C-alpha cells in the first residue's frame, strides 16, 4: 500500500457529495463504536476533518500518505498508532523499517491534529483514532467513498520494528505472500483486492519497481507482463542506477482522483508495482474481482469502505489497555 492540487473549497465540496457507506457493521466487537467521543469530545471529528482538508489542499499527495499511515499501522500489532512513535529509550521506531524508512509521511499533519484535539479536550482522543479518521477523510477529499468509523482505540506503549519489516506487504512480494500477510490480519482476498484500490492515488519511488524494468526474475530480463510502451516510458525516468527517489503515479490516468481507474490500468497491463500486477496474473479469483471493480466504480467504493472498517478493527487496544498519548510521537511519562 504506497501515495496535483485542488482548491480548498473544491476539496470541501467533495465531503458533501461523496458516496456513503454505513457498511452494516456490528460495533460491539472490540468495544469500538462511532459515537465514542460524542460526549467527551463532540468536535473531534470536525477538527480532524478540517486539518486534513487543509493539508490535502496544500498537497494532494498527502491524502495517499495519510491513508497509507493507517494501513501500515494496522498491519503491525493492530491499529494502535505504534507507527507514530519515534525511537526513544527502549523503543525502536517502526519508521526505521524497510517499508517505512524515507517513505511514510504525514506525521506533521497528525501532530497538528493531536495538538488541536489536546486543546479542545485534553487526554481524550487517541492517536490511533486520529489515523482512522484521517484515512477516511483523505479518501473522501480525493472523491472516494465515506464510511462510519468505529472509534475507541487506545494507543500502544511500544512499537515493533520486526513486525513492520515482516508483516507489511512489499512491492515485490508474490501474490501468495501478500495474501498470507492479509490473512494473518483476519482479512481475505476480497479485502486484499479492494484495499489495493487505494493505489488509485499516491506515488511510488523508482526503487519500488525498478526490478520490473530490468531484472524481474534475476536473469537480466524485464517483466514481460508490463505493457511495453508503458515500461519504456517508465525507464526514461527510472534508470538502472540513480534516480532512486524519483516519484511515479500509481495510477497515471487519474492520479489525484479516488476512482476505479487503477483496476482498469491493471487489466491493460499497466500496473506500476509487481504487487499490483499479480492481482491479475496470479489468481483467477483476484482477477475476477479486478474486472468487477473496473466495470463498476460503485461496487468498488462499497467494498473499499467495508474493507477499511474491517482493517480498522484489527486488534484494537480498548478499555484499560494502552493509553491516550499526549504526544503521538512518544509514550506518556509514567
Regions found by a protein language model. Give the residues of each.
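Catalytic cores of secreted/periplasmic or lumenal enzymes
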Residues: 2-334
Amino acid at each position: 500500500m504506497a501515495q496535483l492540487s485542488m482548491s480548498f473549497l473544491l476539496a470541501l465540496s467533495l465531503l458533501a457529495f461523496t458516496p456513503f457507506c454505513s457498511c452494516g457493521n456490528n460495533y460491539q466487537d472490540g468495544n469500538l463504536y462511532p459515537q465514542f467521543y460524542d460526549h467527551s469530545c463532540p468536535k473531534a471529528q470536525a477538527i480532524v476533518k478540517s486539518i486534513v482538508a487543509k493539508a490535502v489542499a496544500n498537497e494532494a499527495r498527502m491524502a495517499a500518505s495519510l491513508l497509507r499511515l493507517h494501513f501500515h499501522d494496522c498491519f503491525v500489532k493492530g491499529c494502535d498508532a505504534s507507527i507514530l512513535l519515534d525511537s526513544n529509550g527502549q523503543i525502536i521506531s517502526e519508521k526505521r523499517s524497510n517499508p517505512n524508512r524515507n517513505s511514510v509521511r504525514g506525521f506533521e499533519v497528525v501532530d497538528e491534529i493531536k495538538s488541536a484535539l489536546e486543546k479542545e479536550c485534553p487526554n481524550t482522543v487517541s492517536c490511533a483514532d486520529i489515523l482512522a479518521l484521517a484515512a477516511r477523510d483523505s479518501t473522501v477529499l480525493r472523491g472516494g467513498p465515506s464510511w462510519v468509523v468505529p472509534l475507541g482505540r487506545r494507543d500502544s506503549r511500544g512499537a515493533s520494528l520486526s513486525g513492520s519489516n515482516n508483516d507489511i506487504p512489499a512491492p515485490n512480494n508474490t501474490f501468495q505472500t501478500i495474501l498470507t500477510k492479509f490473512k494473518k490480519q483476519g482479512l481475505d482476498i476480497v479485502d486484499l483486492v479492494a484495499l489495493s484500490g487505494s493505489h488509485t492515488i499516491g506515488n511510488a519511488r523508482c526503487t519500488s519497481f525498478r526490478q520490473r524494468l530490468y531484472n524481474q526474475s534475476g536473469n537480466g530480463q524485464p517483466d514481460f507482463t508490463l505493457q511495453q510502451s508503458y515500461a519504456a516510458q517508465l525507464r526514461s525516468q527510472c534508470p538502472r542506477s540513480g534516480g532512486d527517489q524519483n516519484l511515479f503515479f500509481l495510477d497515471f490516468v487519474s492520479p489525484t482522483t479516488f476512482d476505479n481507474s487503477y483496476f482498469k490500468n491493471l487489466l491493460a497491463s499497466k500496473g506500476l508495482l509487481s504487487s499490483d500486477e499479480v492481482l491479475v496474473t496470479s489468481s483467477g479469483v483476484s482477477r475476477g474481482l479486478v474486472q468487477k471493480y473496473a466495470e463498476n466504480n460503485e461496487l468498488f467504493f462499497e467494498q473499499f469502505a467495508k474493507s477499511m472498517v474491517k482493517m480498522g478493527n484489527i486488534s484494537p487496544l480498548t478499555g484499560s489497555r494502552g493509553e491516550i498519548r499526549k504526544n503521538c510521537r512518544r509514550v506518556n511519562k509514567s
